[in-house]
Swiss-Prot record:
This is ATP synthase gamma chain. F-type ATPases have 2 components, CF(1) - the catalytic core - and CF(0) - the membrane proton channel. CF(1) has five subunits: alpha(3), beta(3), gamma(1), delta(1), epsilon(1). CF(0) has three main subunits: a, b and c. It is a peripheral membrane protein. PANTHER family: ATP SYNTHASE GAMMA CHAIN (PTHR11693), ATP SYNTHASE SUBUNIT GAMMA, MITOCHONDRIAL (PTHR11693:SF22). Keywords: ATP synthesis, Cell inner membrane, Cell membrane, CF(1), Hydrogen ion transport, Ion transport, Membrane, Transport. SUPFAM superfamilies: ATP synthase (F1-ATPase), gamma subunit. The keyword Cell inner membrane applies. It comes from Brucella abortus (strain 2308).
Length: 292
């Protein structure tokens, strides 16, 4: 049984930890609002761009279609771009994204495909390195980035397009977590290359609208598809930040509550042990007085 001094030290230690988790919860809550607003603001733009691409794609076929839209005609080599948080302490947020990417990689490898992985965020790299260290092609470290901007997504997009033009892969899939609410983030896989317009809402919007394009649709697609890749990556990064802050706020709230429960239990144990010690000392004093 621990001594009273040990119990006091443990209570003080848990209280100090509770202050830290409470502060982290408040910081995450403050960041969550801004991150959520940024993610929600990016959705209409990315969705509308997808709708425009779907509409233009209906007017382009054959040799006029850009390679980024039709692909290489093969699906032998797959590039997985896995976006996770740059830090931990956010529950199962990172592991859920990594699990989705890992399952997809295992499936492709079982089918005899070649898999290459680009990780965005330190935690995803740490998780996937345990099983797929030989498949890790590149890593994008955003730990020094204080304010996420489109230029960061654009750099990743240019890197992916350059690899595609060099013939490094046939299909590119983006993995991230779509923000739903503070307690709900959905791990998502989205095909970037070949550019896919399989979203029903985008197809319906594209079918309802009538556009006239100048210059020709193929020339527009050649410019718009690379832009769309960067836009989709930027949206994924913004969704990830919002999801990370939501998961971190929830995790730190649970940690703060658990610390409070532990403090209560330790305090009860401390008071009982202290009471027992006082009672024992009183009995010894009374026994000594009676002996005299």
């Amino acid at each position: 049984m621990p001594s009273l001094k040990d119990l006091r030290n443990r209570i003080a230690s848990v209280k100090a930890t509770q202050k830290i988790t409470k502060a982290m919860q408040m910081v995450a809550a403050a960041k969550l609002r801004r991150a959520q607003e940024a993610a929600e603001a990016a959705r209409p733009y990315s969705q509308r761009m997808g709708a425009v691409l779907a509409n233009i794609a209906q007017n382009v076929s054959g040799e006029d279609a850009p390679a980024l839209m039709v692909g290489t005609g093969k699906d032998d080599v797959h590039l997985l771009v896995v976006c996770t948080a740059k830090r931990g302490l956010c529950g199962g947020f990172n592991s859920q994204i990594a699990r989705l990417a890992r399952d997809h990689a295992r499936k492709l490898l079982a089918e005899g495909k070649t898999v290459k992985i680009i990780t965005v965020g330190k935690k995803g790299a740490d998780i996937l390195r345990r099983e797929f260290s030989a498949l890790l092609h590149d890593h994008v470290d955003l730990r020094e980035v204080k304010q996420l901007a489109f230029v960061h997504a654009d750099q990743i997009g240019h890197k992916i397009i350059k690899l595609f033009e060099e013939g490094a892969f046939d299909v590119c899939t983006l993995f991230y977590s779509e923000f739903k609410s503070v307690i709900s983030q959905v791990s998502t896989a989205q095909q970037l290359i070949p550019a896919s317009a399989d979203n029903e809402a985008e197809m319906e919007t594209a079918g309802d609208a009538i556009y006239e394009y100048e210059p020709d649709p193929a020339a527009i697609l050649s410019t718009l598809i690379p832009r769309n890749i960067s836009v989709q990556i930027f949206r994924a990064l913004l969704e990830n930040v919002a999801g990370e802050m939501g998961a971190k706020m929830s995790a730190m709230d649970n940690a703060t509550r658990n610390a409070g429960d532990m403090i209560n239990k330790l305090s009860i144990t401390y008071n009982r042990q202290r009471q027992a010690q006082i009672t024992k000392e009183l009995i010894e004093i009374i026994s000594g007085a009676e002996a005299l």
